[in-house]
Amino acid sequence: MRTILRALLICVLAPAAAAMAQGNPPPAAAAPPSNPLSAHNKTIYGGVKMILLRSAEKMPEENYSFKPTDGVRTFGQVLGHVADSQYAFCSRVLGEKNPAPKIEETKTSKGDLIAALKDAFAYCDKAYDGMTDTSGTQIVKLMGADTPKLGALSVNNVHTVEHYGNLVTYMRMKNIVPPTSDPEFSPRGKN
């Protein structure tokens, strides 16, 4: 048995020893991606945009005025709120005055809300596209607190996902499978 183990060990180590004797350096480690923090944040944002827009498209227009109980937003108002919030968060990062389009208060139709949501995401795309790990450390005021720009974009992602969770409830109550549970949509399959 020991002879077999020695033979296996020699077979495994001999080529490595020969390579080292010839002066071949070990393989170089892959270079880390540039701006890994901002790139990851942008990837999350891309997924969040996709599920929000898909939710807006899946819900029939007659359900845009639906709300599960009194005291909460309608499905359409949630979409309008998310669109307004894109401007609020990303204008801070871009150093611009918030356009404050008041979408939640002024848009009610499915077509208008989807268009407004797409416009709001296009506005935010500029903030995510221009972000680097270095520029992400610059401080902006967000809800009265000093916040790194990258943190503000992370809060935007979290806020949007929070409201996606609301939309999931609305869709389930109308027997609509939400995007992240739809095997035809979700890259992970059925959740």
Report the location of each language-model feature:
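Acidic/histidine-rich alpha-helical segments that form the ligand environment
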Residues: 44, 106-141, 147-164
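N-terminal beta-strand motif that seeds the catalytic metal site of vicinal oxygen chelate
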Residues: 33-44
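Positively charged n-region of N-terminal signal peptides that target proteins for export
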Residues: 1-6
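Short, contiguous alpha-helical
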Residues: 42-53, 63-102, 141-191
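Well-ordered alpha-helical scaffold segments within catalytic/enzyme domains
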Residues: 51, 55-56, 90, 120-128
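Cleaved targeting-peptide boundary
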Residues: 20-33
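Bacterial N-terminal signal peptides
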Residues: 7-19
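Carbohydrate-interacting regions of secretory-pathway proteins
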Residues: 28, 46-50, 106-110, 115, ...
